[in-house]
Amino acid sequence: IKVRPAANIIHDAIVTGNLRSGQTVIEATSGNFGIALGLLSKLELNVIALVSRKLQEGVFEELRNVNIRTMDLDMDICPAPGMEGKQDLLVAKASAANIRSQLSNLGFDTDIFDKASSEIESLLASQDIINLAKFLAKIYGFFCPEQYDSQLNIDAHRTVTAAEIDQQLHEKGDSLEGYSIFCTFGTGGTSGGLSRYMSEKYGKKSVYVIFPPTNQDVAGIRTKANADGLT
């Protein structure tokens, strides 16, 4: 399902000149968006995915299979910036050293990293991996799709995903109009896009978000507390 927003965001970036040939793409992902970028193989994208070591091994294998280079972090990807799960400075410094080492192994200039180490450690201290990806893109000249903030993410699910589901139901003599839709919340793109489609086409509010319990760690899925202000 992530191929839809990935294609939409990358297409827009190419058309607008925000993504140039040979430019590295970096994004924070629970795995699926990174895999989706890898599936756009004809574009020959050079992609680095910031991922959590908490992911299942199968996800890492899939990322490798589509030639995505990963930077593994000992923290969640989806917690809302600056909310729960703050780390102390020593842990942040250790995480920064880990990222620096991985950037070096990937062939990038660590002097650039060193000059921005205080900002990077601050982002790591608050587990703000989403904005860390943006910051690394800024200092290294990478392109960050910013899937968590992009209206193009929601638009892709509104114009493509929802329309596909509705079309498949129409082929069976049915329609989305008569259904309630239940989904989880990671970037908010799927739930947001489906909700807008239902509202615009059928004048209904029939999309419901299911959150895991607060103490349950599900890679890429927000708890209700970590989605406050985003839903």
Q: Predicted regions span which residues?
A:
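PLP-dependent amino-acid enzyme catalytic core
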Residues: 1-231
